[in-house]
């Protein structure tokens, strides 16, 4: 993984500080700033997955956000590799670049039918407008409609992208958006 080493010289120390304050720490993996999409060497790609997971476990990160901007968005592989470390690392699936957003498959073969991530985004990027906010909220509905076998449930929650609190026109709009989220 890449990071601004001049700004963050000691990520493990930062994680330890967060833990000492009773907080959890998360890493934003394969973000859209680094488009690792042109690599075709399978050995190199597999090494990136393994080295990234080793870093997350060694530095004791608690959560990782997997964005859909690069070729490293195989959530089942990420989950399997993280499970092998013995350290619980929560996975946020943000594969939003594949509309409609990729939700959990009820037949995950590698995970005994269980969702390989802890929460997943159901919408495209949210904008600071009510139509965008309402569209994103609506994108979660299809994952909760089957009450017998919901695909949004404890351990595998659907969410409608980030909050736009502070970016809306009024305090009341911000509060309504926060409350609905």
Cite the ranges covered by each PLM segment.
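Active-site-proximal substrate-binding groove within the catalytic cores of carbohydrate-active enzymes
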Residues: 79-96, 100-181
